Curated annotation (Swiss-Prot):
It is an enzyme of class 3 (hydrolase). One of its GO terms (molecular function) is phosphatidylinositol deacylase activity. It is found in: Endoplasmic reticulum membrane. Residues 50-63 have a biased composition (Low complexity). Involved in inositol deacylation of GPI-anchored proteins which plays important roles in the quality control and ER-associated degradation of GPI-anchored proteins. Glycans are attached at N23, N74, N865, N873, N1011. Belongs to the GPI inositol-deacylase family. This is GPI inositol-deacylase. One of its GO terms (biological process) is protein transport. It comes from Chaetomium globosum (strain ATCC 6205 / CBS 148.51 / DSM 1962 / NBRC 6347 / NRRL 1970) (Soil fungus). Keywords: Endoplasmic reticulum, Glycoprotein, Hydrolase, Membrane, Protein transport, Transmembrane, Transmembrane helix, Transport. The lineage of its organism: Eukaryota, Fungi, Dikarya, Ascomycota, Pezizomycotina. Residues 28-49 have a biased composition (Basic and acidic residues).
Amino acid sequence: MRRHSSGSSEDDDASPVEAPHANSSRFSAKDSRSSAHPTTKLDHNRNADRPPSFSISRRSSSINWRLPESRNGNGTVEKRPSPERTSPSSPLGLIMTANGELRTKEVEKTPETVIPARRPPWRSPWAITFSALVAAIVGIGFLVAVLHSSVTRQLDPKGCRMSYMRPSYAKLNEFDTEHTRLASKYSLYLYREQDIDRDTKVRGVPVLFIPGNAGSYKQVRPIAAEAANYFHNVLQHDESAMNAGTRNLDFFTVDFNEDITAFHGQTLLDQAEYLNEAVRYILSLYLDPRVADRDPDLPDPTSVIVLGHSMGGIVARTMLIMPNFQSHSINTIITMSAPHARPPVSFDSQSVQTYKDINDYWRRAYSQQWANDNPLWHVTLVSIAGGGLDTVVPSDYASVESLVPDTHGFTVFTSTIPNVWTSMDHQAILWCDQFRKVVAQAIYDVVDVHRATQTKPRAERMRVFKKWFLTGMETIAEKAAPRSEPTTLLTVDDNSDSIIAEGERLVLRNLGTAGTVRAHLMPIPPSGSPGMKRFTLLTDTKLDKPGEHGKLEVLFCSVIPSQPSQSWAGFPSQMDLSKGSTGSTRLACRSAAPDVVSLPASTSSTQFPFYLNGEKEITPFSYLEYGVDDIAEHQFVAVVEKTTAPTPGFVVAEFSDYTQSHRTRHISLRSLLTFGMKFHLPAERPMVSEVKVPSLQSSLLAYNLRISHQDCNGDSELFAPLVRQYLAEPYESKYFVNAREATVSLHGVAPYVPPPLTGKLDENGLSFQFWTDPTCSSSIHIELTADFMGSLGKLYMRYRTVFAAFPLFIVALVLRKQFRVYDTTGMFIPFLEGLDLCLRQSIPLMLASLTLLTLSTGIMAPASNASFWHWRNGTSSIMDFQHNDLLIGTEDPLFLFLIPLIAIVCVGVCTVFNYMALTLTHLLGVLASLVTFHPGWIGNEDRKKTTPAAFFSPSPRRRMITTAVLLLLVTTMVPYQFAYLVACLVQLMTTVRAQRIASELRSTANSNFYNYTHSIFILMLWILPINLPTFVVWVHNLAVHWLTPFSSHHNVLSVMPFIVLVETLTTGKMIPRMGSRLKHVTSLLLFGMAVYAAVYGVTYAYTLHYVANFLAFWLAIVHSTSDSWSLAGLTHLYSGDAGIRKRGKEP
């Protein structure tokens, strides 16, 4: 028998109607409109001061005036404690129970106290408040601006020329499972260039190429082909090179079946283990006369040269820490676009730990005081970065400044390398023609087959690499001319007018105008002269080496005292310019050709430092620069015009004061960003001027440089302005030819990158060098301004990984707000409503706290790091290489705005992501409704009775078996990421079912359960990207028929809480409210999750899964406490509830 109140006979709408017996049309729009008539009538009677009607209605109501029992999400009746207290914030007729639950209390039915019954408002999950909408639009707008800037502004020009080759590969089948357990998965090949290499015998120096993440063994072909052609066409005909120990290179390459090493640490270790055995096998080939064709007088090779691309460079460094590493088998490593400083992504715990082990080993090795204690003393490491065009791995991560001292390695950008002068993307660095030529020639230059290591000593190797990869203008550049022997005997007439007056500039607009060989002698100022003199020379003509017969040669000469009957046969080259005069002077001269610096040609017709396929080849400028102390032992600089016919070409040479050509602008970064910086080069200026701006260090900012036009007073310009921007460390230079405007960006101090072994001085910053025509007697005005729109694009590469962490910061705060409201009012509000509430208080307070935290750590950092700069060998055991790992990866107060900026972007992303999830669940719900079959002969009433149940709880045994099988698979065969993906799919289906019930049978309980499952689904989706990479690696291993069980990620505890929680939600159980202090546990867990995601999430993203897993563990426990909070409630997780489920209303 039904129980009715005098005010209304409608039952509580908060109690869900049972799905199996639900009448979906009962709550249709039509019925809800008709049920509104009694309320309207009551209101009308009340306004007319007439007694209300006491007639009893059989229709359902929104409120049951006495509700001794409440129902959960599946309709199960839950007994509630009887003690009650009135809630001050509850509406009339609502009371708060002892455990914090809102209930209705019985109201005395008198004509004066009759209150019309109203249905609780339906809270649509699609609804969004104006403030949340504005925040989402601002966030998405800023994200679009960042993406648009990254593809349209501050872009480096693409200048790679195409390369060609004729490759062939010989598989070394004898390297099988007898040598390594991984031989069934990986393969070793020997590269051979067709038409050049006649067989597969090894006869040269072994070089091992290691492909990168998902790379192919065939990527070795551009560099290997260039090496084969260069030796065949040039080196084998160079007797001096052959005598110096140069031989051809035998390139070995490894087929890793395109393994994904960036996402899986164990794969990285497996490759390193395999390669160590491969190196041992490769070295053994040179001992086997059947496959080796070498001079028996040469020593057997004991080491290989390693060339690594991308993650292959990390694998190369990992080889040296593996137990099966053969000592001294690797002493030269060249890497291209390899992320040495930190992992490209931090989704895998083993990857992060492997990186830490590798980097700690290298730092510890180079921190040893004595060479005998350093296992890496003979190892050189050169890291080559592609620059701004590399959008796969941030080039900031290629830095090795925090790993090796400059005596053993360095980082250089391709835009710095002479005759390359262009940025490259992640793949182009392998096939770029001008770059591969430099790499091949540099390797040949360090080869010496007369040594067992097959390479020159470490110091000589470093000297060679600096010569090939650096500009030659760095402070560490070594000048070769002062250390060489005199090679040229120059004889000049004493009465010649070829001596330039001291202090004057030599300017030649054309060569060979005298019709004979002519020498211009420039006196060298004495060492220690005031002004710190330096000599500079610029020409568009190639400088001759001793014995060559070109157009121009530069010599440093000393007067030879006249002695009777002295022999001059010791000079390989002699030039007599005395014309038979009796009064002549002989000079012993050294050639400056070894120290020539190549600069990109800058004329009125050039646009880029490089030329492309099909374009006319551009001859670079030749530049010399010496401090007076470097050439103080000589008396003259001789500029010799060797051509006797008029030839186009210019020469500008001068001695200038260092103080006139160098200046430092001490301007704060804030002032520069606000007002810009202006300076001018005076009319009477040196040919080369340099301006250093110490405040320009951040890689997050971009600038625009503008140079005014110079007036040459009618004379033709010798050359157009040439600008070089450069950093001292890492070695990054960019050239701008025919410069009028230039876009300036750099790879300096970058987020999340460890500090260098030797702390950077405050004076280190971006520098600009200007080569301008000094014959143009007009000043040049230069302006440097910040490019704010261009700077937005720099955030993309540096902060794209924040989307693995900061959205969880937002989601955790929203979930926390939803639970707090639910425990207080009994309403589990939708996700967007929770987001709106968080935007009003929680998120701003949290962002303010995080900003203050970053500011405080930035203030304390300098004092704690002061000891970094005083270390005996360049590093320190107390140096904190992880202090940039937190929050936004930088302690610069200028970038504190990035914290709220990233948060507002994540608010927009979370909003869009939420709507995408809503769309997905609704579409799946519609599809599920369409596939539901209802025969046409079934009437409407019967069709309502046949509505399928939303939640059928399987038997406890079946649920336990399913869970046990899944966990058993995790323990033995599949990674736990697979189980997590299954859990996400199950949760999606649960959310779809909850959405169908909530939309068809609108009630508070159904709405609560749907909003709860939807929010849990959103949380799991944001955790999913952290788990997907490992799952992809596992699928890839299956695809390559590698059936060995996955050797990592089998911890069932890492996924069991999620499985239990998702299984519980499939039964339709709503999480119970907690009115005691235990509700603060959920709040603290979600608060801690939000803080952890913001502070540590970017660097340790893999830990976010564990944090969310612990939250799922707690929620599963709360689910087990449906009746009371006790451990006995745990049995409810897998107990059948069909017996206690009510099919309709209680009689």
